[in-house]
UniProtKB/Swiss-Prot annotation:
It is found in: Nucleus. This is GRAS family protein RAD1. The gene is RAD1. Pfam families: GRAS (PF03514). GO terms for cellular component: nucleus. It comes from the Eukaryota.
Length: 521
């Protein structure tokens, strides 16, 4: 990773105009109250406004209601007093504080974020902290301390305070255990990311080094053997990718109904996942159809790992032949930014669909241009449908600290789900966490510029991007089938499926994890 990139990044963060920064942070939570030690009031979440701008992404708006606060929430206020002692209880506006410096804005952002996160957790019915035993109270306190250390360290890193960040990292490393609680484990991954980011911080004026970038479509293109093994385990044990495959195939089968010549363009070939699981399922479903015979199925794989994709193609060809399906498999060795319509051979008789599983977010850059060009190129192919699955979280915000805390919330939910699925000392879980999810986290936390590929965004943001490229959303009406799929595949209790504005969203205890959407030209 280029030190120059970090010099530029941190210069932008530190040199922001304070008054503008104050306006930005105040706009994040315009109605956010002070946490009170009250037993009769709390705060509940409202849906996101459709009128939020792109720069200010997916932040929570709050409104007041009269309910009972759990005991642990009152304890949170006392344990976290240090995070809120700088807030004036008579005035919540950041702009009213005169001449704030950058660190003051960081601190205010942190305070407001913790307030919203605390009340969101307080509103969840899944946790009954009123019945916590003494030892559980102790673990809650330890977890709270770990959260405080993580955010304080992220603040120090954002402010280029290397000495303070190093002290905090030393304490974090002794408390964030790979085989500890779910939050200790996810904290260990964020500690790795913060450590890497800290080592890349250079003086603001140092622009001597350039970035040594390698052409990649996603982080799996440069995966180690350990990461590839971990990715297979993620596919087998977590429902995230399988859910995307199931919903996508259901949409594709509907688009292929009554057609004889079929063509699928797969962007990224499911990150190079071995054996082509998604297309085996599609081929089997097409072979099982008795109403209409498929005369030809074409699959065009877009990717850079040619050897890996060729193996998948050979296996799929044999599989399809055994089921009586004529399959033509081809590869386009390009990344999505360089892909042109002429690279994909489309026959007039064919029904074309485009499939993207956890791929398009890798094309999102600081500017809109790269992704918009890719989407317009796809639109020019006139596919019957474009189906995409993406992580449903805002990890591409303009400020490091906000991005850090959004990803901390998201991956905490994933690690909590792993906690429910696998035993504490299970080596498979450790491999998934430390060799796959940790790599995603480190990419979000430590990388900038073209090396930051895990730029996950919320459904609303994708809706705006797709609309600008000329696509129209096609609602997915299969919540019942998706829930039946969860039961059929023995997916761990705690996973939820909801329809949200035409998309199908898989979540963990209502926290969105993956969203699948369908688009037409």
């Amino acid at each position: 990773m280029s030190p120059a990139l970090y010099a530029s990044t941190f210069k932008c963060e530190v040199d922001e105009n304070p008054s503008l920064m104050g306006s930005y942070y105040a706009s994040l939570y315009p109605n956010l109250p002070i946490l009170e030690n009250s037993a009769t009031s709390t705060w509940i979440l409202n849906p996101f406004s459709d009128h939020e701008t792109e720069t200010i992404r997916d932040h929570k708006k709050l409104k007041r209601s009269t309910v009972t606060i759990p005991i642990w929430f009152a304890n949170f206020s006392s344990h976290s007093n240090s995070f809120f002692n700088n807030i004036n209880s008579n005035n919540n506006s950041v702009n009213s504080i005169p001449r704030l410096h950058f660190r003051d804005h960081i601190r205010t952002y942190k305070q407001r974020y913790f307030a919203s996160e605390a009340v969101e957790e307080a509103a969840e019915d899944n946790f009954n902290y009123n019945n916590c035993e003494a030892e559980e109270d102790g673990s809650c306190a330890d977890g709270m301390r770990l959260v405080q250390l993580l955010i304080a360290c992220a603040e120090a890193v954002a402010c280029r305070d290397k000495s303070h960040a190093s002290v905090l990292l030393s304490e974090l490393k002794s408390n964030a255990l790979v085989f500890g609680s779910s939050f200790q484990r996810v904290a260990s991954c964020f500690v790795q990311g913060l450590t890497e980011r800290l080592t890349l911080i250079q003086p603001i004026g140092n622009n001597s080094a350039g970035s040594d970038t390698k052409s990649m479509m996603n982080i799996m293109d440069a995966a180690s053997e350990e990461m590839e093994e971990a990715f297979k385990l993620v596919y087998e044990n977590c429902p995230h990718i399988q859910f995307g495959h199931f919903v996508a195939n259901s949409i594709i089968l509907e688009a292929f109904e009554g057609e004889s010549f079929l063509h699928v363009v797969d962007l990224g070939m499911s990150l190079g996942l071995p054996h082509g699981h998604q297309w085996r399922g599609l081929i089997q479903s097409l072979a099982d159809r008795s109403s209409h015979r498929v005369r030809r199925l074409r699959i065009t794989a877009i990717g850079l790992c040619i050897a890996r994709i060729q193996v998948i193609g050979e296996e799929l060809s044999i599989y399809a032949k055994n089921l009586g399906i004529h399959l033509e498999f081809s590869i386009v060795e390009k990344n999505l930014e360089n892909l042109k319509p002429k690279d994909i051979k489309v026959n007039e008789k064919e029904v074309l669909v485009v499939n993207s599983i956890l791929q398009l977010h890798c094309v999102v850059k600081e500017s809109r241009g790269a992704l918009n060009a890719v989407l317009q190129m796809i639109h020019g192919l006139s596919p019957k449908v474009l189906v995409m699955a993406e992580q449903d979280s805002g990890h591409n915000g303009p400020f490091f600290l906000g991005r850090f805390m959004e990803s901390l919330h998201y991956y905490s939910a994933i690690f909590d789900s792993l906690d429910a699925m696998l035993p504490k000392y299970d080596t498979k879980r450790a491999k998934m966490e430390q060799f796959y999810f940790a790599e995603e986290i480190k990419n979000i936390v430590s990388c900038e510029g073209p090396l930051r590929m895990e730029r996950h965004e919320k459904v609303d943001q994708w809706r705006r991007r797709m609309s600008r490229a000329g696509f129209q959303g096609s609602p997915i009406k299969m919540v019942v089938q998706a829930k039946q799929w969860l039961v059929k595949n023995n997916v761990c209790d705690g996973y939820t499926v909801v329809e949200e504005k035409g998309c199908l969203v898989l979540g963990w205890k209502s926290k969105p994890i993956v969203a699948v959407s369908c688009w037409k030209c």
